[in-house]
Amino acid sequence: MHDFTYYAQILISGLTIGSLYALIAIGYTMVYGILRLINFAHGDMFMVAGFIMIYITSWSSSFLGAGSIAVGLILTLILTVVLGVMIEKVAYKPLRQAPRMSDMISAIGVSYLMQNLATYDTGGLAQAYPNIPWLRKEIALGSITVKRLAILTPLLTILLVVALVLIIKHTKMGMAMRAVAKDFDTAQLMGIRIDRVISITFVIGSLLAAVGSILYFSYIGQVSPTIGSMPGLKSFVAAVFGGIGSVPGAVIGSYIIGICETFIKSNQDISIFSNAFTFALLIVILLIKPNGLFGEKLKEKV
């Protein structure tokens, strides 16, 4: 019989993993809400952000010392955003008038391109992620001892989600995003700068992926060329579970998956099924509620 401390540790771990999934899932759901595109390259953006951090800190540590971590954090955020916007301009924008399948194939192509470039550069080997000492320190919460990272991750995620919701609900750009998500063609006819809205959507999604990358790889300690695939897929499932196109839905779906997955992993008899559970959940949700928990039914134009 397990005690309270055992279940509390699992719950905290589940909230941490769920928060990391949420930061990625928001990128999926925002891009889909605006472009009706499943950006399958998003998980690999997360992976690339990890390698950016590794390379920048390695390059700058010889002349900046401990300051290389701060420089690495800032440049990782900036360069990941730049990469995200470049991918949209090169791989997605030229295909806006093409059949929807073309966008999806392009996204899959970008995903494999990033994985193969990373594999070529690293030889397919995992690279150690820079140690951020402040995040690794442990703190006591009553009878429970956890790393600061486990407390910071959910708090930072909630703060970022609240800020994002406020931007979407109460700013001119947020209003433009909602208009484009509601009716792309009408928004364009009304004079809304579609390209600007789409670019900002990719900026937000890429920025959140970079933040998630920093937290996730600080948590597991290493980056490999294919490591973005599974978190990316699980975050996509979370977005569908909550109702793709809904930011709150993506967050709630992420926490449900993160907590359930952690409980399954904690049981040695069924831990091998932790990944299978996520995708089984997707099948069940699509059968029972195809639009997810908070998704709206969309009418396709013909």
Residue ranges and their predicted role:
Residues 33-41, 82-125, 167-174, 179, ...:
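Short loop segments and helix-boundary regions at transmembrane helix junctions
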